[in-house]
UniProtKB/Swiss-Prot annotation:
Pathway entry: Phospholipid metabolism; phosphatidylcholine biosynthesis; phosphocholine from choline: step 1/1; Phospholipid metabolism; phosphatidylethanolamine biosynthesis; phosphatidylethanolamine from ethanolamine: step 1/3
UniProt binding sites for phosphocholine: G119, L120, S121
Organism: Homo sapiens (Human)
UniProt entry tagged with the keyword Phosphoprotein: yes
Key words, A-Z: Acetylation, ATP-binding, Cytoplasm, Disease variant, Epilepsy, Intellectual disability, Kinase, Lipid biosynthesis, Lipid droplet, Lipid metabolism, Nucleotide-binding, Phospholipid biosynthesis, Phospholipid metabolism, Phosphoprotein, Transferase, Tyrosine-protein kinase
Pfam families (alphabetical): Choline_kinase
Assembly and oligomerization: Homodimer. Heterodimer with CHKB.
Organism taxonomic ancestry: Eukaryota, Metazoa, Chordata, Craniata, Vertebrata
Activation and inhibition: Homodimerization or heterodimerization is required for the choline and ethanolamine kinase activities.
Protein name: Choline kinase alpha
Disease: Neurodevelopmental disorder with microcephaly, movement abnormalities, and seizures: An autosomal recessive neurodevelopmental disorder characterized by severe global developmental delay, impaired intellectual development, microcephaly, early-onset seizures, and movement abnormalities.
Amino acid sequence: MKTKFCTGGEAEPSPLGLLLSCGSGSAAPAPGVGQQRDAASDLESKQLGGQQPPLALPPPPPLPLPLPLPQPPPPQPPADEQPEPRTRRRAYLWCKEFLPGAWRGLREDEFHISVIRGGLSNMLFQCSLPDTTATLGDEPRKVLLRLYGAILQMRSCNKEGSEQAQKENEFQGAEAMVLESVMFAILAERSLGPKLYGIFPQGRLEQFIPSRRLDTEELSLPDISAEIAEKMATFHGMKMPFNKEPKWLFGTMEKYLKEVLRIKFTEESRIKKLHKLLSYNLPLELENLRSLLESTPSPVVFCHNDCQEGNILLLEGRENSEKQKLMLIDFEYSSYNYRGFDIGNHFCEWMYDYSYEKYPFFRANIRKYPTKKQQLHFISSYLPAFQNDFENLSTEEKSIIKEEMLLEVNRFALASHFLWGLWSIVQAKISSIEFGYMDYAQARFDAYFHQKRKLGV
């Protein structure tokens, strides 16, 4: 998902340091032109008539040779797909310094970079070697550059916050990025995610996997849904070296709510939208939600926490395979959490299409929430992969577990709407990306109250 990001200070990027800092920088220097070649030719001198001896004349200056035409720069994507010069410069340096082989000697004018659209929390770029450059070993020809979004290094949304509070926010942001990077590296080593090529305070370099992200409509396809369920069950079964207490869900919502209650907008339309959202008495609503979910059994597992179509890759060349054609990516929100949230959140994402190209740059359709039949299809694929002895249970026992799980995930779907609703209000304040964050927040809270009515809670 897309947000404002910092690209560091004026110095060249360094792998050292944890805290991000926004600074100024300069544009990349223009590429030089080729050197002019010199040439000379020997011409015979002419003899003069009369009695005088012939004089040796100095040779005339060499005939001018045509200047070689400057070599055109490597083809680049259209201007609207190019990052700003400062970001391009830093991307080049990161690739040159962190990647081996041909990247080490790559000239800046040979460097290819283009923006990858579609995220809402990070800025993504594809960086590549030119076609004319041969690799020297097994180094990648293409990599993915991820620059962290503001939400990971979130500072207070209001400048009047105390210096101590600002320092705490900076520390928490740095801690979140360190944990996320460790998590990414572990998943890469276990072949459950892309390879990690480089890491630095502002982001990282990842394996570029030939693939495409799923479309929202594909989430409901039976074979796709079944494999997502199996992948999620595998994710939930992992043992990770992180805090096992399920603090993430309500801890994150409380942090976002604290920021939301302090946010001040100057734009009239945003003021009105915020006033409407605050009229829901969000602190009381959060306490009621907490009470409901505390009474809802749900195992604590290692959760992805953002399993939406943009974070699921359909691998190139495996489109027609029955299984193993998908890969989960983007683990920045992953943590130990309640299983019901991860699945309920995924079901909520069936309703939202983030590929819409006009304001507010998303479409919501509450009727796309999975039916009971679709939910049971997902759960029926999930449970055998999650619970080893599930297939040995009786039909009646299986039915009871499935019904309990339906209640679990549909209640925790409420938390998904509440969390991302608050998140979007915060993004409206701190993000520089063109997206209707306040409209999205309203859509999520509309769905939250709709889900409450359906559940009768």
